[in-house]
A protein has these predicted regions:
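Non-transmembrane, aqueous-exposed alpha-helical and coiled segments at domain scale
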Residues: 1-117
Length: 117
């Protein structure tokens, strides 16, 4: 797969998947953490819809990293973290901790935060 996407909620995942489909990109949408290897398009995108928008950061990090590992095992060459752009889901927030954990696992030195879709 060209792109692996992790979304913090179902709505964001479906918005992203719909946008990609409208652009002609083959997309496979997964609800929750996948248990089996992906069978999506090798030239397309896998979107994993999690329900971590309003959970504690530790739980969000654990699930996001599991999704990342699944996407990478399926051959994702690029990763996109689709988070809620309103930043108001939890008192302390989990967007930053999840992004930092993903960066750590990917050994990325930089990332872009784009709070709009």
């Amino acid at each position: 797969m060209i792109l692996g996407c992790i979304a913090d909620d179902f709505t964001g995942a479906t918005d992203l998947a719909a946008l990609l489909v409208r652009a002609g990109v083959p997309v496979s949408l997964r609800i929750g953490l996948p248990e089996r290897p992906g069978i999506g398009p090798s030239d397309g995108v896998e979107v994993v819809a999690l329900k971590i928008r309003s959970v504690p950061a530790e739980q969000a990090v654990t699930q996001a990293l599991a999704a990342l590992d699944w996407l990478r095992a399926g051959g994702a060459r690029h990763i996109y973290w689709k988070y809620c752009s309103t930043f108001d889901s939890t008192a302390r927030g989990n967007i930053g901790p999840v992004a930092e954990a993903l960066m750590g696992r990917l050994r990325a030195r930089q990332t872009l935060y784009v709070p709009a879709f």
